[in-house]
Every structure is written in structure tokens, then in C-alpha cells.
């Protein structure tokens, strides 16, 4: 039996921490880190110009939806800081969603609007939403880095309070006057 997969391309700071968390998310089949969103061909760690460090995620849409993947993405990095995650600063560490089709674009924009309206995050989302372009796979030493170096650097963690209420819950919250 062949599993149907979808592809997501996300950037949220250093790709090591993003990959370590996303690879374990239910429905994720494979991940690889690389560079995208810039103008340098054949990007490498030493020469990636204005590309973002990104992660390509292949997932089973019968197990997890693109929306669920994005909600988790927004929990594991700070989408309210421009060109920065933790101590890492610069365009390489920007928050971005690189959509592969118009449906992904719509879902990304809708999710960002709901996050901004929720008031749960410390500021407004600055995540770029851009069409996916070439993805340059990072060098082998960057793939699954935190699997090989468990105490290696990361600034990514799950923020339990940064979770959007389910849509039906959101209506109940508004009706209950909690917001």
C-alpha cells in the first residue's frame, strides 16, 4: 500500500532544533534541512546568501493536516521576532512558510490571522508567506544534527501556552467572556 504524502517547507530559525521537533510530530514521514527563499544557487552553509535555514517536511495528510503542522510550527519557534530566534540573528533565521500550492497559502494566511487575533503570542506574527522555490539540501553534518549530538545547540521547544484553541473551543471561549 502506497502512502500519499504532502510537502511543507518551513523556516523558523536554526534548522537543527526545528528538525528535532518536527521529525517526531505524528504523521511526519521524513524531514531534511536546507536553504531556501534566497537567490544564491547551490546554497551551502558557508554560502547561502539571503536564504533561510529551512526544513522540508513530508507528511501523511491522513494522519495530520497541513493546518495541524503549522499550528505546531508556531508553537516551537517565536514567530513574532523578525529575523531572529534565540541568539541567532539575521535573514537566515527568519520565520517563513514556503507554500507549495494555493491551498497551503490560504491555510497559512488563515492560521496567522487566527494567531494574531488570539492574543496568546507575545506580539504580532512576522512570518513571511512565500511561494516555495528551489530547496538546497544542507550538508550531511546538518541533517538530524540533534539526533547525533543530543546536547547540541537549540533554541526550539514546545510552548504549551502558545496553542490555538480548536475552532469550536474558540466560539465557546468568546461566548464565555474569557477574552
UniProtKB/Swiss-Prot annotation:
Pfam families: PMSR. It catalyses: L-methionyl-[protein] + [thioredoxin]-disulfide + H2O = L-methionyl-(S)-S-oxide-[protein] + [thioredoxin]-dithiol; [thioredoxin]-disulfide + L-methionine + H2O = L-methionine (S)-S-oxide + [thioredoxin]-dithiol. Coiled coil: none annotated. This is Peptide methionine sulfoxide reductase MsrA. SUPFAM superfamilies: Peptide methionine sulfoxide reductase. PANTHER family: PEPTIDE METHIONINE SULFOXIDE REDUCTASE (PTHR43774), PEPTIDE METHIONINE SULFOXIDE REDUCTASE MSRA 2 (PTHR43774:SF1). The active site is at 14.
